Amino acid sequence: MEKIQNINKIKQYVLSIISDNYNEGNGVMVGNKFITAGHVIFKCENPNIMWNGKKIPLINPIVFHNDENDSDSYDIAVYSIPNAKSPLVLSDVVPEKGDVLKSCSWRMLGEEYVECNAVVNGLKEGNYYAADTDKQLKSGSSGSPVFLNGEVVGILCAGNCNDDNTPCNTEWPLSLCVFLSSKVILELLETN
């Protein structure tokens, strides 16, 4: 299957998660799987997505880990969506320092589209790598993908920007974001 390079075509596979308690988050449809951050699902009551005009409840994940504070663990939830046919794929490449990734997500419960560049800064620890974004990604963007050459190379799991635009950690740039590597996600899916 040919890779989609145009972000305007890719963004249709980035979905806002809807929940009864209005917790915000995103995920991405890759093949017949919906992938997001585990902490997003953990905080949601009755999470679901809209796919092809249908409301799909997110129940019975095939992979679920909510270990967002351990770099050797995982912050991920993966759901099988049998009738989904997304052309997106997970990359087996870990981005290197200087690589420019494309991030896209939805905030305000799917009303506000956010697109930005994320430059990999070389910080890597365990299953995660960091990048500096040219727009402030906040909690509503958690679970959203980053792309390199039309492939998903990571899922946003943490940022350094509080909702009031102050840094979580003053020693790091406000634009710092942390992504779970798609290579790690592929390895997890092979064992589940």
Question: Can you describe what each PLM-predicted range is?
Answer:
Residues 6-18, 23, 82-87, 110-191:
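Active-site region of chymotrypsin-like
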Residues 11-12, 16, 20-21, 28-33, ...:
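Serine endopeptidase catalytic core focused on the charge-relay Asp
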